[in-house]
Regions:
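Acidic/glycine-enriched connector segments
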Residues: 1-169
Length: 169
């Protein structure tokens, strides 16, 4: 009998909504990275083997890098990149684009929700993440509006477990 794989998806804010912005040396960002790694380790110990990242700037990229770094210790874990459309990174800085491509090069799979940009492709990506996970790990500041909030509500509507880390604390 084939063993069922448990899946965790990530959702979280982009840098403009994070207290540290793009400054990953800020103590609040360092603390969030530690909290994310601790939570990911805990999920692996609970049997989660597959991690889904939407690969947006901010929390998605941070979480994806943590999963990749933990693969040396936990070779059973997989990173699946769920992209809203081909070329989502083209308007980003050169450094962010390089980071994005480095993660994609190490991913176990890449899934495009759409090949081209469409009005709802980000929402569709977020719904895909929630629908294809057992657990949603969210870095969320409590604002009602926005993609992170909508993804959390959708996962809850589906009856999935949601773990929230607050970037303001």
């Amino acid at each position: 009998m084939k063993k069922v794989r448990k899946t965790c998806a990530f959702t979280g804010h982009r840098p403009k909504k994070l207290p540290w912005g793009y400054n990953e040396t800020d103590v609040r960002c360092v603390a969030m990275k530690v909290a994310l790694e601790r939570q990911i380790r805990s999920l692996v110990q609970e049997g989660v083997t597959d991690f889904l990242s939407g690969m947006a700037e901010g929390i998605d990229l941070l979480a994806a890098e943590i999963v990749l770094n933990l693969r040396a210790e936990y070779p059973c874990i997989k990173l699946h990149c769920i992209l809203p459309y081909k070329g989502q990174e083209t308007e980003w800085s050169a450094a962010s684009q390089a980071r994005y491509h480095a993660i994609l090069a190490q991913a176990d799979s890449i899934i495009y929700v759409s090949r081209i940009f469409r009005k709802n492709c980000m929402l569709e990506r977020n719904h895909f993440l929630a629908a294809h996970s057992d657990v949603l790990l969210a870095v969320y500041n409590g604002e009602y509006r926005g993609g992170t909030a909508a993804t959390i509500r959708y996962a809850q509507k589906l009856g999935h477990s949601v773990i929230i880390l607050d970037p303001t604390k």
